[in-house]
UniProtKB/Swiss-Prot annotation:
This is [LysW]-lysine/[LysW]-ornithine hydrolase. It comes from the Archaea. Coiled coil: none annotated. GO terms for molecular function: cobalt ion binding; hydrolase activity, acting on carbon-nitrogen (but not peptide) bonds, in linear amides; zinc ion binding. Belongs to the peptidase M20A family. LysK subfamily. The keyword Zinc applies. It comes from Saccharolobus islandicus (strain M.16.4 / Kamchatka #3). Catalyzes the release of L-lysine from [LysW]-gamma-L-lysine and the release of L-ornithine from [LysW]-L-ornithine. Pathway: Amino-acid biosynthesis; L-lysine biosynthesis via AAA pathway; L-lysine from L-alpha-aminoadipate (Thermus route): step 5/5; Amino-acid biosynthesis; L-arginine biosynthesis. Its main location: cytoplasm. Binds 2 Zn(2+) or Co(2+) ions per subunit. CDD domains: M20_ArgE_LysK (cd05653). The keyword Glycoprotein does not apply.
Amino acid sequence: MQQEKELVKQKAKELLLDLLSIYTPSKNETNATKFFEKISNEFNLKLEILPDSNSFILGEGEILLASHVDTVPGYIEPKIENEVIYGRGAVDAKGPLISMIIAAWLLNEKGIKVMVSGLADEESTSIGAKELTLKNFNFKHIIVGEPSNGTDIVVEYRGSIQLDIMCKSTPEHSSSAKSNLIVDISKKIIEVYKQPENYDKPSIVPTIIRAGESYNVTPAKLYLHFDVRYAINNKRDDLINEIKDKFQECGLKIVDETPPVKVSINNPVVKSLTRALLKQNIKPRLVRKAGTSDMNILQKITTSIATYGPGNSMLEHTNQEKITLDEIYIGVKTYMLAIEELWQKS
């Protein structure tokens, strides 16, 4: 057992430092092609690269371990200190991805066929997960790899709506203007704004506003973007109509949308992950997340799904991303125990 643990930690150290050295912000995933070709050859896992998104698929089987290879922008030089690995994506989500790759390798060596994916664009518009759902893939079970503290199993994510609003007005000299598009729209923003308060209440948050071209002329055009988040019990259409009613004189366009997801605690993946943690004397927690993940998309191609992964979720998107080799080992062990149970029951 100790020998296996040291093998996993040594391989995790090697692979994670290698992957962290490759800068892969969203839309730049092709930078990791040689890494996945090396993994394919070393671990004897068939490699497929999805053409539209440049997502990487390793192995074959009816069980999918799905994480993502892209990160938020901002390269952090990878390093290791006392079995703690630092770097952009160490937590979100190259750490979980490496755990999944090692688990898939070890499981396939045992004759348990598992597919693992390094999907593209999760930090943007999830084009990798979306392409996967269009490729006629269907899986008995999917585990999504995101940092969940190594103890938490995510059973619910909120949905999101990304809205562009374009408004127009007649420009006037600022010294004598009777109206002002910035002022008028600002009032409407305040009226429609819903601050993020708790999971069950929707939020409507302005994130971008652009207007004006000259110091002394009121704007003729204004661009506004809203990021809308809502739980599965909220009514999507009511939220959109509320914004439409407030901005009747403006054009409104949904530029991206991700549905909410909620799974039963009796879902086979949830139960197998729970038991896998208990076997390691780790107390599992079932949680829900205010953001979105590829789980929101991948629910379309399976009836059994949940999210779990190593890494402190509080460090996501920060310049302090770090993960320990012990955390990665727990992730590998949890994925393996869960999939072995699912495999036996299928």
